[in-house]
Amino acid sequence: MRKQKRKEHLRFTVDKAVSTYLFNDSISLNEVGLTRHLKGQSITYELLEESLETYQKLIDHEETREKVVVLAEHYLRDYYKDQLLKGRWSKRMNTLYYIEDFKMRSLADTIWMLFQTHSKWDEEKEQIIRTLAALQDVRLFGMLVEEQPDWSVGLYKEIFRRMDRDQFKYNVSELDSFEHPVGHAMLDVAREERDEDLLPLFEDLLSSHSLEVRIRALKGILALERITKVELLTSFASSSEWVERMLFARIAGKLKQSRYISILNELMGDSNWWVRQGAAEALFHYRDGVLILEHIHTNHPDPFARDMARQWVGSRDSVSDGGC
């Protein structure tokens, strides 16, 4: 009971000191007064971590969030360095998470050293990499482009999502080939960004001899819902790969250009269900899409096309009737 009371008293003391510094511009770092509570007491460090993490999640004000980082750097840097070098596995992992959350760039050299010396590939190694990415470590970013290590696409995506956007665009511009996991991940994250500055890249990669790259380029154009070189799309309607035909149909549905209607009509009779589905959905979103689908349902020579058109016209009727 006494131990719990002491812990709650410490929690109150820590929270009060943190909030006073964060929300009072007249209080300097030297006036926070936490140093004497931290000496040799790991519980106080843990309470400080919890307090800073809570405020960081609750606060949107950029200057106040920066003060959270200042507090973390001032009070936790040496403690974290000691945990990284001497702590048990669970402590090291938690420390890496907190360093990432608090963006403690002063510890980047220590973590880079761990990256170089940690030979075993495990969860800790991957978190070291994620933390370096969150700290915007240019040594890691340079290595990705120059060496393209054989890491998973998933890990690469986690790295690129942590990059500053300008740094990400720079790395994209520096990559010679997108045919490896690092390139695949870059294109996936570029699509997530929906940044129109990357549209020329997607358009250029439509001519790649790699199916994986072409698919990612098509998905990027689909996400942006625009293209400047419309002539580049048409050939994908007759691709031997069904996924490219499907993506053509979906993009055509976003662009809604009349030049694609006859092609979509043909794709309604495609041998692949996903392509037929994509073509029907695309036509459905054209201005006269329902009329076009009704015509296909009545006149298309392919029974699969007629059936798909019937389903989409029926879905319109179902919505109009309130689903009854």
Protein language model regions, located:
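Long, mid-chain structured domain cores
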Residues: E50, I59, E66-T131, Q136-V138
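Extended hydrophobic secondary-structure segments
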Residues: L267, V275-R276
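Structural detector for internal amphipathic alpha-helices that build alpha-solenoid repeat scaffolds
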Residues: E62-L71, M93-F102, E124-L135, V153-R165, ...
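Short inter-helical turns and helix N-cap capping residues of alpha-solenoid HEAT/ARM repeat scaffolds
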Residues: G87-R88, T117-W121, Q148-S152, F178-H180, ...
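Amphipathic alpha-helical scaffolding segments comprising HEAT/armadillo-like alpha-solenoid repeats
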Residues: T35-K39, L71-L84, M104-Q116, D137-E147, ...
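Membrane-interacting alpha-helical segments
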Residues: E49-H61, E244, W274-V275, D302-R306
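N-terminal topogenic membrane-targeting module
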Residues: M1-K86, M93
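Alpha-helical oligomerization segments
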Residues: L293-H295, H300-M308, S315
